[in-house]
């Protein structure tokens, strides 16, 4: 609230419109893209095991928090583990190197984004492994992991600019 220059009540009201995770009492936001609740997308940073809602979320959090991270997520088509090492500046390692990320553009309001978009944003071992899935989701694009990171780097830079850590 202080950073945004908004009253606390208005900030909480805005956050309640987003698809966040709240504690059992409903008074504390505990997840908004990054969470302690297990998902397919394991996100390790500073030795802490966290999770992201979407494959795409995992790609930009290192930039937002200013720290390197390791992503581990299964290929949705084959179940094979994909591992990605990221820094705020770029992709350091991808295993397998052929891994791609599916991307969809939400046609929904922000409160529905997790349900509507995250299920369609996944990691795949390769474009070939994703071919059957993509045939069922023609609206989705497949991008190599490094290309997705660079795309997010530009977007994050435009949105947050010099407010980013580091």
What are these regions (language model features)?
Residues 30-81:
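Aromatic- and glycine-enriched beta-alpha-beta binding-site module
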Residues 16-27:
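A short, conserved structural fragment
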Residues 9-11, 25, 72:
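Residue-level detector of family-conserved "landmark" positions at structurally sensitive sites
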Residues 11, 27, 35, 39, ...:
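Residue-identity detector for threonine
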Residues 3-18:
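Short amphipathic alpha-helical interaction segments
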Residues 7, 27-30, 58-60, 110:
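Intrinsically disordered, low-complexity segments enriched in polar/charged residues with Gly/Pro
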Residues 6, 27, 32-34, 48, ...:
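Intrinsically disordered, low-complexity regions
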Residues 70, 80-166:
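Long, low-complexity, charge-rich intrinsically disordered regions
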């Amino acid at each position: 609230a202080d950073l945004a220059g908004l009253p606390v009540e208005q900030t909480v009201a805005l956050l309640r419109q987003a698809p966040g995770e709240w504690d059992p009492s409903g008074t504390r936001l505990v997840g908004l893209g990054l969470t302690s609740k297990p998902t397919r997308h394991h996100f390790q940073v500073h030795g802490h095991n966290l999770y992201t809602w979407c494959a795409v979320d995992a790609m930009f959090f290192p930039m937002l928090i200013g720290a390197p991270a390791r992503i581990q997520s299964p290929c949705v088509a084959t179940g094979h583990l994909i591992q990605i090492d990221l820094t705020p500046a770029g992709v350091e390692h991808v295993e397998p190197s052929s891994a791609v990320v599916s991307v969809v553009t939400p046609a929904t309001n922000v409160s529905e984004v997790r349900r509507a978009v995250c299920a369609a944003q996944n990691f795949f071992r390769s474009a070939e492994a994703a071919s059957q899935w993509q045939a069922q989701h023609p609206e989705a694009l497949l991008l190599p992991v490094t290309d997705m990171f660079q795309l997010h780097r530009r977007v994050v830079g435009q949105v947050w600019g010099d407010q980013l850590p580091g």
